[in-house]
Structure formats: C-alpha cells, structure tokens
C-alpha cells in the first residue's frame, strides 16, 4: 500500500502524462491525412481525390470550361487552399514553356455589380474561402470577370482578365 502522500503525487504524475499524451495525439490527428491513391489518365496528375491536367492550347474562359466538362465532374480548376495552389503552380511551371497566365475556374457572373468584388465564385460551385489575389479586383478601374493564375507570381496569385482572352488552362476532375 502507498503512503498517503505518495498517492496524490502519483495521481498528479499520471494526470500530467495523460495530458501530454492527449496533446501529442491531438497534434498528429490535425495533420493532413495522406491522399487516397487514385488513378489519373495519361497527361494528368493526382492530388488528393482529383486529377489535374494542363492544356496548352489557348481558349476563352468559357470554351476552356466546356472542354474541362468533357471529363468526369470536370471544370476549370478551383483552388481551395494554399497547398492546392502550390500543387497547381508546380504542375504549370513544370509543363508550360510560355509566358502566359493560366485560366482557373474563378469568375464573377455579376460582372462587378456586387460591392467589394463580392460576386466572385468558382464555376464548380466550391465555396470561395481561400483567396490569393495579386491585386484585389475591387481596386481595379476596369476589371475582367474571369480569373487566372498570374505568371508574374509564379502561378501562386490570381489575376482577373477579360473572359474572351485566349489562355492555356487547368482542368480539375475525378476519374
């Protein structure tokens, strides 16, 4: 049997160990889980549960999205996090030999009628929580209403363009 003073000490030590263990386990559970292994068609790359493909033949924003829709659940890419932005930027930098911006699935169907550039959304209907504007469209005197990855930012920031401009594009789809 433990002396009466030993039991509170032992309880305190046990409680401290349990608290430390829960913190360590909590840190591990917050890390991103490894992506599911998916098979993507030739010419595309997997990231998490989607396939991504860069198309070098320039098209208007609408024609590019129509081309992307030929793939299962396909649209111009929606960039939902900084990690996904880095993946897409790397895909573009490693496969494109032109000095061009790249269409993404961001657009403003209100054509600027909502205050503070509030009309911007993803064509895929994903929620626009992550933003990476090179220059806020609300600060531009004559903005375009379709989004692109900016070459000058290493494809890590967004820029608005006239939707009828012909640019290469990235599709995001399932397969």
From Swiss-Prot:
Disulfide bonds join 40-51, 68-171, 146-163. Transmembrane segments: none annotated. Its main location: secreted. One of its GO terms (biological process) is antimicrobial humoral immune response mediated by antimicrobial peptide. One of its GO terms (cellular component) is extracellular space. Residues 38-173 form the C-type lectin domain. It is found in: Secreted. In pancreatic acinar cells. Residues 1-26 form the signal peptide. Residues 27-37 form a propeptide. Keywords: Disulfide bond, Lectin, Secreted, Signal. Might act as an inhibitor of spontaneous calcium carbonate precipitation. This is Lithostathine.
């Amino acid at each position: 049997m433990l002396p009466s003073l030993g039991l509170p000490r032992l309880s305190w030590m046990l409680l401290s160990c349990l608290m430390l263990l829960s913190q360590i386990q909590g840190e591990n559970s917050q890390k991103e889980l490894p992506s599911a292994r998916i098979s993507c068609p030739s010419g595309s790359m997997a990231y998490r549960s989607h396939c991504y493909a860069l198309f070098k033949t320039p098209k208007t924003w609408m024609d590019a999205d129509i081309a992307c829709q030929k793939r299962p659940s396909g649209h111009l890419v929606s960039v939902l996090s900084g990690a996904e932005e880095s993946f897409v930027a790397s895909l573009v930098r490693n496969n494109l030999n032109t000095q061009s911006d790249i269409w993404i699935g961001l657009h403003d169907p209100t054509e600027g009628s909502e205050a503070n550039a509030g009309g911007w959304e993803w064509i895929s209907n994903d929620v626009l929580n992550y933003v990476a504007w090179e220059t806020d469209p609300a600060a531009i005197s004559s903005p375009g209403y379709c989004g692109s990855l900016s070459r000058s930012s290493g494809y890590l920031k967004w820029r608005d363009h006239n939707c009828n401009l012909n640019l290469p594009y990235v599709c995001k789809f399932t397969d």
